[in-house]
A protein has these predicted regions:
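A structural signal for short secondary-structure junctions
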Residues: 67-68, 144-147, 169-170
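Short amphipathic alpha-helical segments
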Residues: 15-16, 87-89, 165-166
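A short acidic, glycine-rich active-site loop
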Residues: 48-58, 95-99, 173-175
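Short, glycine-/Ser/Thr-/acidic-enriched flexible segments
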Residues: 8, 32, 80-82, 158-159
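His/Asp/Glu-enriched, well-ordered alpha-helical/loop segment
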Residues: 74-75, 80-156
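Histidine/acidic residue-rich metal-binding segments in metalloenzymes
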Residues: 2-75
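Glycine/Thr-rich phosphate-binding loops of Rossmann-like dinucleotide-binding domains
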Residues: 11-12, 35, 83-85, 162
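Short, surface-exposed loop/helix-turn segments at secondary-structure junctions
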Residues: 91-92, 161-175
Length: 175
């Protein structure tokens, strides 16, 4: 059983309890749930509308705890590239979802820079764990002889400012 797009601390607790009982279950969350809280709603409006909705600070902390202790297996993009004019509609009319495929690595690398994650943990949650869970490891998710050479080189000493103008997605709007 795989539970996707966890946004609540209660969901993390349910997965943890199931694992403690020996139930084979995995779960993941998305960058918006790790980086935003319901307090960002006034500033971002419909841009952060998603299903499930972004929750409070305590839920966010439990998501981080679940990610760090292995209760949650990885972070996925849940990329939903709606046009800016669609996302600027009133909350109940705007489509749900965020354009996160381009920003996910950046916000998680920022978490590495701030000491919340290690680079090794980042590799595990973005590459190794998804490959293991979905049966593509070690062809994917590993740097080993015979594996696909899918990797990214980053310079953690270099400062980088992301701009919406740099986005390649259909939308140039990402929380």
């Amino acid at each position: 059983l795989h539970i996707l797009h966890l946004a609540s601390g209660e969901g993390v607790e349910l997965i943890r309890a199931a694992k403690d009982k020996g139930i084979k279950v995995t779960g993941e969350t998305c960058p918006q749930y790790l980086m935003l809280t319901d307090e960002d709603g006034e500033r971002l409006g419909s841009a952060m509308k998603g299903y499930p909705p972004v929750r409070g600070q305590s839920d966010q902390e439990k998501l981080w705890e679940g990610l760090m202790d292995g209760t949650l297996s990885f972070v996925c993009s849940d990329h939903a590239p709606h046009l800016p004019e669609e996302k600027r509609k009133p909350l109940w009319e705007a489509p749900a979802g965020c354009a996160t495929i381009e920003t996910m690595p950046l916000v998680l690398l920022d978490s590495v820079a701030k000491g919340r994650l290690t680079l090794n943990m980042l590799v595990k949650i973005l590459s190794e764990q998804p490959a293991r869970i979905f049966g593509t490891y070690p062809q994917k998710g590993a740097v080993l002889p015979g594996s696909d050479a899918d990797f990214v080189i980053v310079d953690m000493g270099k400062k980088y400012t992301f701009s919406q103008k740099q986005m390649h997605s259909r939308t140039k709007l990402s929380p």
